[in-house]
Amino acid sequence: VRYFPLGEDNFAKLVEELNNANHFIFMEYFIIKQGEMWDTILEIMERKAKEGVDVRLIYDDFGCSMWIPSRFIKDMKEKGIKVAAFNPIGPVFNLRQNNRDHRKITVIDGYVGFTGGINLADEYINKKVRFGYWKDTGVRIEGEAVWSLTSMFLSMWNYIVHSTEDYSRFMPAQHQKAPFENDGFVQPYGDSPLDHENVGENIYLNIINRAKNYVYIFTPYLIIDHEMLTALCNAAKDGVDAVSYTHLRAHET
């Protein structure tokens, strides 16, 4: 696992890995905006699709509704890119519209994956100023742990396009002959409207409740419920250094 404290660092490595793709590229993002970041990625996706690479994109229809052209899906398909919109917004609001896809996932050949808080928009790499200097973080994952990201993407893809595609041909071992070197355990996870379980919240509560020395939370959105607040307070009472860092001008799209 490699940690990127800044979006521009994450972007540089992402571009490098996308250019190395030989079998498939899966990308799933909440926000896509036209600009330097997206134009760079789109050029690679189009080129790789022409080379025979399986290139797929999932985007959240609400998150992208103000930023992409109305013919976006048609344009992508003309470039050879398979595309699916998560939960398209309609003229009539209902509670189902609250289900949004906030994932930021890229999987390349099932062996390299990227995730974190970085969407595909220029402010995330500080090519565009919005609310001052923009800080979001990301991670690059390599090896068998990437399978979790691959399966999350494919489960969402199958749900959107109503497919029953077999996942096995996308497993890392299918495209990487060398044995994986393991020096620890990495398990990416994700929430989904399909799960009917608050996976993320349960993991956070477990981490807080088991903390012995400190809990440091870094987030632009500090909106916690009573159970989470109680866990943090109890940890502090037990001598754990419980600190949450947030921004005074957290944005909302």
Segments the model singles out, each with a brief description of its role:
Residues 197-198, 217-218, 224-225:
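Conserved small/aromatic sequence motifs within transmembrane helices
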Residues 221-240:
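Helical hairpin unit composed of two closely spaced alpha helices linked by a short loop
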Residues 30, 220-221:
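Glycine- and other small-residue-rich loops at beta-strand/loop junctions that grip anionic moieties
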Residues 246-253:
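Conserved small/polar residues in nucleotide/adenosyl-binding loops
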Residues 1-202, 206, 210, 234-237, ...:
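N-terminal localization/anchoring segments of enzymes in phospholipid and broader phosphate metabolism
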